[in-house]
């Protein structure tokens, strides 16, 4: 997940373009979404031929790098001759996806704002898009999230960026995960998805949740800005990625939020 932008290139009043399902199983896939890169690589090693510079998992991923999520190298992607390009409406920009389509490449655009949407889109990408069998890790992830115990509810500030300060707002995947873990973020009703916030005017909260991505908050960089609030440092990958890490996310995040 790169630095957040409060935009929805394929949402709102603009309808999603057709979501292609290939007539045959793709043999060459390029992923422009770190979460989905990991999902495809773990499920079908060798299927991916290209991924962004931000695609850090699996650690041993050996594919051609094609630039960033917000500035992919369209000629480099085209040169790889992929059967399918996987994208996301929040991670990637409309002009880049339009350029890929103009080059004749099929682009599958995902839309994930909640855990149920993540599970649905993962199956669509892997099974419908890539022609793969439903992976066991996806079943394990769904089971892990179904098995959550009820927790006392707490209110939290959840920054995602510093300089300027930005936080989780409405309609976010990370916010949905936290809510399922008993944490209600204080800007959930904000008009923006990633609003800028004034630390001098914070709503009442029980804690501050500080992920290590997209901004890398640490014990020495973040908690000091919220005196009097307990700080929970959490794995940004487990909070914001929708892929194999979802199977362990309830345990990892739950432990950090205690």
Language model: regions and residue ranges:
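N-terminal ligand-binding lobe of clamshell/alpha-beta domains
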Residues: 2-258
